[in-house]
Amino acid sequence: MTQATPPAKPVPNTQRGFLAWVERVGNLLPDPVMIFVWLIGFLMVLSVIGSALGWSASLPFSGEKPPSGGVVKDGVLTFEATSLFTEDNLKKLIVDMPRTLTSFAPLGVVLVVMLGASVAERAGLFSALIRNSLRDLPRAFLTPVVCLIGMTSHHASDAGYVVFIPLCGLVYAAAGRHPLVGIAAACAAVSGGFAGNITPGQLDVLLFGFTQEAARIIDPTWTMNPLGNWWFILAIVVLFTPIIWFITDRMLEPRLGPWTGNPDDDLKAELTKSVVTAEEKRGLAWAGIAALAVIAVFAALALWPGFTPLIDESQKGTAQLQPFYQGLIAAFTLIFLLGGIVFGVSVKSIRSSSDVVTMMNEGIRSLAPYIVFAFFAAHFIAMFSWSNLGPIAAINGAAALKELSLPAPFLLVCVQAFSSFLDLFIGSASAKWSAMAPVVVPMFMLLGISPEMTTAAYRMGDSYTNIATPLMSYFPLVLAFCRRWDKNVGVGTLLSMMLPFALAFMVAGMAMTAAWVYFDWPLGPGATVHYSLPGAK
């Protein structure tokens, strides 16, 4: 599949109204890295002010070991604001700078998973898997299948945008349906359904890394569970699929009318190339066997009688599974790595071990912007903890919310709404969550809401506004795909196609989040809506 190249400059905006304002304001924002530089500067000034004014926060505590920065006296845990310019904090900043970065949980997780994912992507496994999933589909069931594949394509890194979305335009055209309908449905699933998936994957590992850093501000023992949102993200797929199906087939397609154009020679050539070859089918079969082998090994390490390195026998209940949950990062990596290798060998995209190493190198090289971002995000979160402003904001914020007696479903919907508002201007899910998590995660823990539930609410809000803003990083690319079929498509045209999806997702997502909390449904294996702080009275 030929990869389209996004325009070098932002798409010109001749529209007026709210969305045009969003685009103009968003274009004025600096790079996420510079946002964190400014946040760090603001935090340093705020720490001096807080220390001078004697800011503090307290809560009852009966545990053995208080969180870092807290002091226990007479059964009360107290945090006092500390200037980041104290001798001790300056020493941490300067001497421990490398350690602050290397101990940043999301960075290590992303680097490890990318070693496998980069091989799978560059060997062609993800592309072939997506193309194979769309072949020989009945015309009437194109849309629901596109929804399911689109929301699971998040495992395939950028392939969902670069391969799947333009391919859907081709597939719809080949089925005699309007290609823009296919592109819109695919974009709604891939981008608007960003929070949904059938199984946990790289995004879960990444976001829970930030959640863990934030949760440990008040509970140093809290450890992430990559499966902690599994049932929630699966429910998103179940909820969003009929919504996309209805809007696509009943609203958007009648509005666009029948497609009367003819694909040019380049598009016909791409349609021909989208066919999965016999070699690729054989490679997919071997990749499936490799994935099953990895799953079998990990299952054996957890279930084999007398030999269970992935089970903590010293714990009870679901706590025994903590090593298994943490080992899933390695499992994802090996599934991608071995699947990519056997597929690449089958289709001859990998001819030697040096090809595998080269693919890994290219994958890590593509993470350079993220590593730069991680340096500043790691220091922001660490300095938030050193200054004690994180737990102070969480404790006082939780106390204020308790006084208001607002129901938990409403509070989490507010988190979701705030996340979706930020998403209009800042596209990066990790950038937004790394800034929000140090405040909202511990605050909601003190309100009895688990880090997993707060993360789920954030993910829902971060998802649906992706398709409602021209600042989404792939928006110019999707617009370019549309213009290959209709050169008159503009920013307003694409937004008008995607807004019905975004609005429907917003209403349904808020209702689902509120219902999940109200009925206290489990979020995933070993993950619940509610939480109790160890040692808190």
Each language-model region and where it sits:
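Core transmembrane alpha-helical segments of multi-pass membrane transporters/permeases
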Residues: L29-G41, V45, P67-S127, L321-P391
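Juxtamembrane interface elements at the cytosolic ends of transmembrane helices
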Residues: Q15, A123-L129, P242-K273, A300-E313, ...
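Membrane-core helix-loop-helix motifs of multi-pass transport proteins
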Residues: E23-N27, V163-W259, T277-G283, A457-R459, ...
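Intrinsically disordered, low-complexity non-transmembrane regions of multi-pass membrane transporters
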Residues: M1-L28, A57-F85, E253-R282, V529-K537
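Helix-loop-helix module between adjacent transmembrane segments
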Residues: V112-R122, I130, L134, A140, ...
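Hydrophobic core segments of alpha-helical transmembrane domains in multi-pass membrane transport
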Residues: F36-A52, V110-S118, I149-M151, A189-G193, ...
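Interfacial loop/helix-cap signal at membrane boundaries in integral membrane proteins
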Residues: N13, G17-A20, S56-L107, I217-N225, ...
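Hydrophobic alpha-helical transmembrane segments of multi-pass integral membrane proteins
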Residues: V110-L111, P138-G169, A174, I371-A378, ...
